[in-house]
């Protein structure tokens, strides 16, 4: 399966605000049924847009009580970039849930390409996470374009690769 999906344009602050208040497509409870991650590593609170096998958009409410803020950094809390990338990968895992070739398989992080960090994520921010499937090859390896935004501003974007295992 392959797709020639082009990443969508960056959402405006107004569009991001509309999605932030949209009813969930998947609640936290449903996300727990889809993803293997658990607290404190589950980084998607709800899914607000879902096109099976193509695209997903979700939210992560970043609070001061996040465990990573204790050490990153004690007097200036900033969400670690690697966890922003992990949150994007998790929303990418949700994109794959309804693909027939993927049922019962686990998507593992296989690489990142061209990921750039544009602004810090702070306590009180709401991350809007999106993932668009670009390709799946030989039903084993694939690539997604992922993006994180806060209030219509780009935080992080890039391509994430995954490997499917039984």
From Swiss-Prot:
Keywords of this entry: Cytoplasm, Lipid A biosynthesis, Lipid biosynthesis, Lipid metabolism, Lyase
GO CC list: cytoplasm; membrane
Its biological purpose: Involved in unsaturated fatty acids biosynthesis. Catalyzes the dehydration of short chain beta-hydroxyacyl-ACPs and long chain saturated and unsaturated beta-hydroxyacyl-ACPs.
HAMAP family according to UniProt: FabZ
InterPro entries: FabA_FabZ (IPR013114), FabZ (IPR010084), HotDog_dom_sf (IPR029069)
E.C. no: 4.2.1.59
Subcellular location field: Cytoplasm
Entry keyword Lyase: yes
PANTHER family tied to this protein: 3-HYDROXYACYL-[ACYL-CARRIER-PROTEIN] DEHYDRATASE
Main location: cytoplasm
SUPFAM superfamilies assigned to the protein according to its UniProt record, in alphabetical order: Thioesterase/thiol ester dehydrase-isomerase
Any one GO molecular-function label of the UniProt entry: (3R)-hydroxyacyl-[acyl-carrier-protein] dehydratase activity
One Pfam family linked to the record: FabA
Tree of life domain: Bacteria
Uppermost EC category: lyase
Leader sequence residues: none
Family: Belongs to the thioester dehydratase family. FabZ subfamily.
Protein's name according to its UniProt entry: 3-hydroxyacyl-[acyl-carrier-protein] dehydratase FabZ
Reaction(s) this enzyme catalyzes, per UniProt: a (3R)-hydroxyacyl-[ACP] = a (2E)-enoyl-[ACP] + H2O
Active-site positions on this chain: 72
One BP annotation, GO: lipid A biosynthetic process
